[in-house]
Structure formats: C-alpha cells, structure tokens
C-alpha cells in the first residue's frame, strides 16, 4: 500500500521572519499516524497548536496565516509545499514566533531540511482526496477550479502589465507524474515589486524582505544580480504557493487545479467550497503502489 509518512529524525533551522525581520527558530519533528501537519508556537506558555487545515486559515494578506483564537502562524505556504512535494503526512512544526522563517523565499531549504531529517514510512494507508466533479470559484477575472484528473496536475496563469513580464512565459502546467517537484518547482522564489515593498515597509511589514529571499522587480528590471533560477520562475512560484495552500486539505490530491491570477485568498476559498461540496470528492487509499496515479520519491533516497 501507499503508506503515510513522517520524518525519521527531528531537525532544526534558524531564519528571519519576512514581516517582523526577527530571528525565528524552527524545529521539524516526527508525528504519529493521522496526526497531520501541526504548527506549534513554542514561544507561548503553554505552547499552542494549530492544525494545518483550510478552516484554520484566518488571513491571506501577503501570505497564508493559520489561526487558533488570537494565536497566529503566518507564511506557512512554502513549508507546506515542501511537505506536499515530499509526501509528508504527519509532522510537528515548532516555531518561536508568529511566522515561519522565509529562508530564501522558496521551498528549497525546507526540502533540504526534510530530506536531511530522513523520511519514515508509517504502517497506515496514505489518504488522498480524489476530485469527482468540477468546482469553480471566481472573483472578477481571477479564477480557481478543481477538475477530475487521474494524477496531480497544476495549471496556473499570471498577468502583469510590466516590462519584466513582456515576452516571458506567464503560464505553466505541471503534471507531477512526469515532473519532479524538487527539481522543477521547489526552488522558485517569491517575487515582489519595489514600489509595493517600500509601501509595505512604511506600514511596518516585510521588514525581513531582501534580495536574499525574494526576486525583486523595479520599474524596468529584475534587481537580483544573479537573475532568475528558472526562465518561468514567477509563475512557478505561484504553482509552489498553490501546492502549499492546497495541502491544507490535510491530504494529498488526485485531480487537477487550474488557476488564473489566483492568490492565497482564492486558493483558500476554493478549498472551502470543495469541502462543502461533498458530492465533488471522495477519500481514497491505495493497497497497491503500482495501481496508484501518484508516486513519491523513495524514502531511501532522502536520508
């Protein structure tokens, strides 16, 4: 059967919070079968747990924020994307502040941490949500939708009226049966416009943002000396974000996600709509790995 997965060992890292600019200590720990991904604020006494579920999303301004009462953990999407890409079902994520460290602005450092900790299969079937019917949410010209598909595929389109985006590939369709999340998606960094960053800083936000953890665009060009990691890094980062946001279903997906100009807010809205539409999905497990439409990197490779 396709089994649930957790980490083999705990692992620690330190980074800065994107919004506070303060140092954040991060610890990833193994968790038991069916625990899911749980964020834990260890700077509070007693510590407060927030399960990584769509209904616990309390804010989607600039990042995806999970809440439990008045306790928050923001910028969870890049770490969630790494968990999804490596098929981790169960883990405790301890943070010493109200946001996950931004690292280099991609999921790459989190992939490295998880692979360094090692991946442990658990003796229980991995659960998947299989899309049975189309579910669409629109907001003006923005759109996000689920479609039935025997595998996992993400199609994303972006549109910016800006010189840097002219002549660049602004859409991507990634079929994960033939594309490696680790190689093709995980290293795509978040991006922002200089004028927006200056405005946000004036409001006390993105204090930790820099050319070390984002692709920054001014009026005419990319400001990062080393340029882009992929020609289509902008849209690939949107795919990365979407994978992290979708993993707040609490299980892996069998289906296609199509989005146009969607962000964290619409990603979350369509998840909530899907959950309400109980005729549009079913929970499935696989006794035989060979019959499954999705496969994951073998744990032995990730030690």
Swiss-Prot record:
The coiled-coil segments of this chain are none
Q: Which reaction does this enzyme catalyse, per its entry?
A: a UDP-3-O-[(3R)-3-hydroxyacyl]-N-acetyl-alpha-D-glucosamine + H2O = a UDP-3-O-[(3R)-3-hydroxyacyl]-alpha-D-glucosamine + acetate
Question: A GO BP term, please?
Answer: lipid A biosynthetic process
Could you tell me the EC number(s) of this protein?
Answer: 3.5.1.108
**Pfam families, per the entry:** LpxC (PF03331)
List of catalytic residues: 264 (proton donor)
- What is this protein's function per UniProt? Catalyzes the hydrolysis of UDP-3-O-myristoyl-N-acetylglucosamine to form UDP-3-O-myristoylglucosamine and acetate, the committed step in lipid A biosynthesis.
Q: What is this protein called?
A: UDP-3-O-acyl-N-acetylglucosamine deacetylase
- Which residues are noted in the entry as Zn(2+)-binding? 78, 237, 241
Keywords, ordered alphabetically: Hydrolase, Lipid A biosynthesis, Lipid biosynthesis, Lipid metabolism, Metal-binding, Zinc
On the tree of life, the source organism's domain of life is Bacteria
The record's section on InterPro entries has: Ribosomal_Su5_D2-typ_SF (IPR020568), UDP-acyl_GlcNac_deAcase (IPR004463), UDP-acyl_GlcNac_deAcase_C (IPR011334), UDP-acyl_N-AcGlcN_deAcase_N (IPR015870)
**UniProt KW Cytoplasm keyword:** no
UniProt similarity note: Belongs to the LpxC family.
| Keyword Cell membrane attached | no
One GO MF annotation is: UDP-3-O-acyl-N-acetylglucosamine deacetylase activity
What cofactor does its activity depend on?
A: Zn(2+)
In the UniProt record, which is one GO cellular component term? membrane
């Amino acid at each position: 059967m396709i089994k649930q997965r957790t980490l083999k060992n705990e692992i620690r890292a330190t980074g800065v919070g994107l919004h506070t600019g303060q140092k954040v200590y991060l610890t990833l720990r193994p968790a038991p079968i069916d625990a899911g991904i749980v964020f834990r604020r260890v700077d509070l006494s007693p510590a407060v747990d927030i399960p990584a579920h769509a209904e616990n999303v309390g804010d989607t301004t600039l990042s995806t924020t999970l809440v439990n009462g008045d306790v928050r953990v923001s910028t969870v999407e890049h770490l969630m994307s790494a968990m999804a890409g490596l098929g981790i079902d169960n883990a405790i994520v301890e943070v010493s502040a109200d946001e996950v460290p931004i690292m280099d602005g991609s999921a790459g450092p989190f992939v490295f941490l998880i692979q360094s900790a090692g991946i442990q299969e658990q003796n229980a079937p991995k659960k998947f949500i299989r899309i049975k019917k189309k579910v669409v949410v629109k907001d003006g010209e923005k759109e996000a939708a689920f479609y039935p598909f025997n595998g996992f595929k993400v199609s994303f389109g972006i549109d910016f009226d800006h010189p840097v985006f002219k002549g660049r590939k602004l859409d991507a369709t990634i079929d994960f049966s033939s594309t490696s999340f680790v190689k093709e998606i995980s290293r795509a960094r978040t991006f922002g416009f200089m004028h927006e960053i200056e405005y946000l800083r004036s409001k006390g936000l993105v204090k930790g943002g820099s050319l070390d953890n984002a692709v920054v665009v001014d009026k005419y060009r990319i400001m990062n000396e080393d340029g882009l990691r992929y020609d289509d890094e902008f849209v690939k980062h949107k795919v990365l974000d979407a994978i992290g946001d979708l993993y707040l279903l609490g299980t892996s997906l069998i289906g296609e996600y199509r989005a146009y100009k969607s962000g964290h807010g619409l990603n979350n809205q369509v998840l909530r709509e899907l959950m309400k539409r109980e005729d549009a999905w079913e929970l499935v497990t696989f006794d035989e790995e060979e019959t499954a439409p999705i496969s994951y990197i073998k744990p032995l490779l990730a030690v």
